[in-house]
């Protein structure tokens, strides 16, 4: 049996599908369906059981779970603007710690979601404490358990892998609202208003030039499955493409894919701006000093751990995503 927490969420539901594609259906899906619409992310998935996150936590504390092959822990509060530190640390740190202790006691492989938010304003994205300067309590909540893992690496009884997700986009993120990917928001803006809005230049970046390491959720699933297949690998690893691309590239991929749907030719960035299809708005004052203007994963450790598959660039991955979303309409 494999446990997937956050199973009705974005990455979690895609992980369940990835397991299903391998013929694995002995899955315990764990989530909080207070937002009932999230059930839609599990409708086409095959699972053995569903547990509410609170019931699951009690079972972990009581040691009342069946024999497990692995735990893929994706459940967390992912709202980077959440200010309630007590809530954030309980959901993102304390629950992870409890699951870790259970898995170590039972010798069960444990893969968990960390985040590139641990790097904060750093300009170096290598898995090293010298580079970890979170800008918000979300990033700190993720860093805390990474630090625990480092102190326990020499005494592990089973695999533990923390994956620092960079900017993930793809199917089944619609429930995330404002925390959904920029690709999702660009797509909906263009369909509703006929143009896409991006932040104007700030912090030394040109209009729309702020850059992130955007990674398709399909590649995130592939990384998770790689470690599931290689239980001898443990540690904290960046989960990105190793390629920073500007928000302009995401918007252009969205707009040109939707234009192609109408039989219209792709346009270069300058022409998209000239035609008003891409527009720039002032950078918000409340984000200054709290915003990562640039991220690019160093994937050296990931590649050294044996993950050799190529990863999608923005043009490929975002276009796939837009076509997938439009096919549902």
Curated annotation (Swiss-Prot):
NCBIfam families in the record: heptose_epim
Cofactor: NADP(+)
GO molecular function terms listed in the Swiss-Prot or TrEMBL record: ADP-glyceromanno-heptose 6-epimerase activity; NADP binding
Cofactor note: Binds 1 NADP(+) per subunit.
Similarity remark: Belongs to the NAD(P)-dependent epimerase/dehydratase family. HldD subfamily.
EC number: 5.1.3.20
Pathway annotation: Nucleotide-sugar biosynthesis; ADP-L-glycero-beta-D-manno-heptose biosynthesis; ADP-L-glycero-beta-D-manno-heptose from D-glycero-beta-D-manno-heptose 7-phosphate: step 4/4; Bacterial outer membrane biogenesis; LPS core biosynthesis
Pfam families noted in UniProt: Epimerase
Binding residue positions for substrate: 167, 178, 185, 199-202, 212, 291
Organism: Bordetella parapertussis (strain 12822 / ATCC BAA-587 / NCTC 13253)
Protein known as: ADP-L-glycero-D-manno-heptose-6-epimerase
Reaction(s) the record says it catalyses: ADP-D-glycero-beta-D-manno-heptose = ADP-L-glycero-beta-D-manno-heptose
């Amino acid at each position: 049996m494999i446990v997937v927490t956050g199973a009705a969420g974005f990455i979690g539901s895609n992980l369940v599908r990835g397991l299903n594609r391998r013929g694995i259906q002995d899955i315990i899906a764990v989530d909080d369906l207070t937002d009932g619409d999230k059930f839609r992310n599990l409708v086409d998935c095959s699972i053995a059981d569903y547990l509410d996150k609170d019931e699951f936590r009690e079972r972990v504390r009581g040691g009342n779970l069946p024999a497990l092959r692995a735990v893929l822990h994706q459940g967390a509060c992912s709202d980077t603007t959440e200010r309630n530190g007590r809530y954030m640390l309980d959901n993102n740190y304390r629950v992870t710690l409890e699951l870790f202790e259970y898995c170590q006691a039972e010798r069960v492989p444990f893969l968990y979601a960390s985040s590139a938010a641990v790097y904060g304003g750093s300009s170096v994205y290598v898995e090293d404490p010298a580079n970890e300067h979170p800008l918000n309590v979300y990033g700190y909540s993720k860093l805390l358990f990474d630090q625990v893992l480092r102190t326990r690496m020499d005494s592990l009884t089973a695999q533990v892998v923390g994956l620092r997700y960079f900017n993930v986009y793809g199917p089944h993120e619609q429930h995330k609202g404002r925390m959904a990917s920029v690709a999702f928001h660009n797509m909906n803006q263009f369909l509703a208003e006929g143009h896409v809005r991006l932040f104007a230049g700030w912090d030394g970046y040109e209009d729309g030039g702020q850059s992130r390491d955007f990674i398709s959720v399909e590649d995130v699933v592939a990384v998770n499955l790689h470690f599931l297949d290689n239980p001898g690998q443990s540690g904290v690893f960046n989960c990105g493409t190793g390629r920073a691309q500007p928000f302009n590239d995401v918007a252009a991929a969205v707009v040109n894919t939707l234009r192609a749907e109408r039989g219209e030719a792709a346009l270069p960035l300058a022409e998209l701006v000239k035609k008003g299809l891409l527009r720039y708005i002032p950078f918000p004052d409340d984000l200054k000093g709290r915003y990562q203007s640039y991220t690019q994963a160093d994937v050296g450790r990931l590649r050294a751990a044996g993950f050799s598959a190529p990863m999608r660039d923005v043009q490929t991955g975002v276009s796939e995503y837009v076509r997938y979303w439009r096919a549902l309409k």
